[in-house]
């Protein structure tokens, strides 16, 4: 099969240099299409003509609309949580709905978005993980678990908004007197400058702009991943799957319709999160095994194979 993914543009590097999400997904799918023996390319929308490929896969709403105008059939994959946050009267929702309506099929990485868009072309398609890049190391149950959060915080133009739940993770660490690391891009400085109380915790370690090449080592230096997010386009999102692949049991909040073995589901409630922490510590080996199994199931090689089946059904 001849497959082309549309480059997301807007200054985004594919393959990704450092922090990123869409560009990582595009690149991993590309590599795994090739691994399955398909022809795969990544091109800008303006470079694609009708009939050039068997399938054109677009990850950005306005670029999908551009393909419509060029007469290029496409599969659309939505990644933008703002379409939900701003509501159905917003420009971003209408743009993504237009991209869906003009597609031959549309994919969303969360089941709540299937219901939200309520369109017959929309189906759930989970994110994946490169298990060669992220993998576990042997680790016995720690006496004092080191907690880890990895995220780019903020919401809808407000970079200090605690969408990712840093305050809950730090409060959990304080309540149990445990070390915690919060890692992400420099954008997270806005959160800490607006939540100065967090900086008073002596066991808090903050890392900005960690290169991708050092991310696996960061996971291996920690024991439990904390992710009390309030809004994600992906359930599970990429960092949850990365943490699981690296062998970290997880305390997180994600949609109830999606099963994720190896994680304890807790709302944004420090006391409920503490219960999850206790359950993980009491069943350490079981959580480690289950999160590893989840990561293997979600390997990008498997996700690419499933995606090709979807292509074959609609072209």
Stretches with model-predicted labels:
Residues 86-87, 129-144, 158:
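Acidic anion/phosphate-binding donor-loop and adjacent secondary structure
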Residues 192-216:
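Nucleotide-activated donor-binding/catalytic signature segment of Leloir-type glycosyltransferases, i.e.
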Residues 144-196:
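Conserved catalytic-core segment of nucleotide-activated headgroup transferases in glycan assembly
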Residues 220-234:
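Acidic donor-binding loop of glycosyltransferase active sites
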Residues 268, 282-315:
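A charged, aromatic-enriched C-terminal amphipathic alpha-helix characteristic of glycosyltransferases
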